[in-house]
């Protein structure tokens, strides 16, 4: 497995698409998620007759982290013989603030989780800060990624969302 970070953007210095196409095949170039739209995936032949999986992650640090969690980590788990989606716990939570996004793209919003004092066993999801793909502070504060479905323009405070826990990994 070869993982490149910062070479899959759409800018002038993004060489991953060209290189992956030269050494093997490029099977995927973009995904409809913020953060993380530029994502390259392909494979290249190895000298022993096998193949090497190629991943090109976006250049913005938050985008790179999110695409790694969603696309690369499950592949690495599968290659180790583990359940590809068993590594991260998912939980339901209630948003404490509104989220706006473009319709047509599933969004992964950095949130801080807090147990709901009024309802034991329930979680509240607070926005971890500004949500730009370059804002590392929100990622550093986050312990979850709230999933906002692609068919909505966002979610209001009080909406129930699914959250991928970043603070807990299960076997």
Annotate each predicted stretch with a short phrase.
Residues 19-171:
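Flexible glycine/proline-rich
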């Amino acid at each position: 497995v070869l993982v490149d970070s910062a070479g899959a953007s759409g800018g002038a210095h993004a060489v991953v698409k060209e290189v992956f196409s030269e050494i093997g095949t490029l099977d995927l170039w973009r995904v409809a998620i913020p953060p993380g739209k530029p994502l390259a995936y392909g494979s290249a032949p190895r000298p022993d007759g096998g193949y090497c999986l190629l991943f090109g992650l976006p250049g913005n640090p938050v985008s790179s982290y999110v695409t790694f969690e969603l696309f690369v980590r499950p592949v690495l788990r599968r290659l180790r013989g583990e359940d590809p989606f068993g590594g991260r716990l998912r939980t339901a939570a209630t948003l404490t603030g509104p989220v706006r996004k473009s319709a047509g793209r599933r969004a992964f919003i950095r949130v801080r989780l807090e147990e709901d004092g009024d309802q034991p066993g329930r979680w509240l999801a607070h926005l971890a800060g500004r949500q730009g793909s370059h804002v590392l502070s929100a990622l550093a504060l986050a312990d979850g990624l709230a999933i906002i479905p692609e068919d909505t323009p966002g979610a209001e405070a009080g909406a129930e969302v699914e959250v991928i826990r970043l603070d807990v990994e299960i076997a």
